[in-house]
C-alpha cells in the first residue's frame, strides 16, 4: 500500500462532489464545539441540548469536539476546510470538560436527540465509556431506532471506541474506522472484535480547528472516523444529485466494498483501507450505478479545468482560494 500521511489524505478528499448537500445531516457525538471559530462561519450547525452540552468550557473535551467538527464542516477558504462543508451538522456532545467519560444513558440520549433532528449519519468518537459490558435498555432502544431509520453509525475503531458496545446493542449499520500512519501501521491499536467490518484510513497529522481561533494537528482513530463520516455524507449527496433516495446503509457498504486491500501486521487488524479520491469515486459508482468523477462533479474541479485546459490533478491544492 502506498504510504500516505493523514494530511495528504485530508487534502485529497476535500470538495469531492462539491462539498455535500444541505439536505444531508451528520451528527457529531463528541465533545462540545467552539462554534465561534472562523472555519464555522456559514456552516449549517445545529447545537443539541444534551446533558454534556450544559457543562461545556474551554477544556479537553471542547478542544477535541471542535477539531472533529472542523474536519467535516470547516468552510471553504477558511483556516480549516472540511470534507463536507455543505452538509448540515448536528452537534450532540457526549463528553464533558468537567468529567471524564460518557455513561450509556448520555450516549443513548445523544443518539435519540440526533435522530429526532433528522440525522442520516452518526459520528461517535472514542473515549472513556461506562465499563458495564452489556448495553442498557435505553441504548438498545436508541440503536433499534437507528436500524429502523437506516442511519449509518461511523465510530472510532480504536480500543477506546464504543463500536463493540453498539454491536452488542444490535447495530446493523456500523462502520468502525481505524487510523494508520504513513507506513500503514495502526495508530493507537484497534478493537480486534470489529476488524472484519471496518476500514483504516490515514490518520496522522490531521489539521483542524483549535480553541481561541487557532489550528492544531492531531492524530488517531477519532479524527480518521470524522473524515469518513464526512465522506459518507458526500456519497449520500451524490445519490441526491442523481435523483436517488439517499441510502446511508448502502453508503456504508459501498465504503467497505471500495476499499484497498491492506497488508495488516496482525490477523485481527482491519484488512481494508482508503487512501485517496479513487476510493471515493469507486464507492460513489457502486452506490449510484453511475461512473463518478469527483473533479467533474465539483465546481472547484470545473474551475481548474477551465483555467488550465489540462488534465485535472486529483490533489485538492488545485482549487481557487479567496
Language-model segments: residues:
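Solvent-exposed loop/turn segments at secondary-structure junctions
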Residues: 32-35, 78, 95-98, 127-131, ...
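Protease zymogen maturation seam
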Residues: 1-25, 37-39, 300-309, 315-321
Amino acid at each position: 500500500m502506498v504510504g500516505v500521511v493523514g494530511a495528504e489524505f485530508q487534502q485529497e478528499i476535500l470538495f469531492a462532489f462539491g462539498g455535500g448537500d444541505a439536505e444531508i445531516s451528520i451528527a457529531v457525538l463528541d465533545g462540545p464545539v467552539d462554534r465561534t471559530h472562523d472555519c464555522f462561519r456559514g456552516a449549517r450547525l445545529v447545537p443539541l441540548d444534551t446533558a454534556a452540552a450544559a457543562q461545556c468550557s474551554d477544556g479537553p473535551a471542547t478542544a477535541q469536539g471542535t477539531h472533529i467538527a472542523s474536519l467535516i464542516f470547516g468552510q471553504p477558504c477558511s483556516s480549516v476546510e472540511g470534507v463536507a462543508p455543505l452538509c448540515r451538522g448536528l452537534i450532540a456532545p457526549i463528553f464533558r470538560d468537567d468529567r471524564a467519560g460518557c455513561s450509556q444513558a448520555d450516549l443513548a440520549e445523544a443518539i435519540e436527540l440526533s435522530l429526532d433532528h433528522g440525522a442520516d449519519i452518526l459520528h461517535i468518537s472514542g473515549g472513556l465509556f461506562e465499563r458495564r459490558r452489556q448495553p442498557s435498555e435505553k441504548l438498545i432502544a436508541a440503536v433499534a431506532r437507528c436500524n429502523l431509520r437506516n442511519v449509518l453509525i461511523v465510530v472510532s475503531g480504536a480500543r477506546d471506541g464504543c463500536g463493540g458496545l453498539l454491536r452488542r446493542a444490535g447495530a446493523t449499520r456500523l462502520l468502525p474506522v481505524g487510523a494508520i500512519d504513513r507506513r500503514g501501521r495502526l495508530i493507537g491499536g484497534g478493537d480486534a472484535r470489529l476488524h472484519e467490518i471496518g476500514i483504516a484510513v490515514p490518520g496522522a497529522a490531521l489539521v483542524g480547528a483549535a480553541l481561541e481561533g487557532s489550528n492544531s494537528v492531531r492524530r488517531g482513530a477519532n479524527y480518521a472516523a470524522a473524515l469518513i463520516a464526512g465522506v459518507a455524507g458526500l456519497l449520500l449527496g451524490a445519490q441526491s444529485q442523481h435523483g436517488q433516495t439517499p441510502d446511508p446503509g448502502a453508503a456504508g457498504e459501498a465504503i467497505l466494498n471500495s476499499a484497498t486491500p491492506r497488508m495488516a501486521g496482525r490477523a485481527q487488524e482491519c484488512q481494508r483501507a482508503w487512501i485517496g479520491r479513487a476510493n471515493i469515486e469507486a464507492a460513489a459508482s457502486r452506490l449510484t450505478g453511475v461512473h463518478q468523477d469527483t473533479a467533474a462533479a465539483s465546481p472547484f474541479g470545473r474551475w481548474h479545468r477551465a483555467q488550465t485546459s489540462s488534465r485535472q490533478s486529483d490533489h485538492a491544492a488545485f482549487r481557487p482560494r479567496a
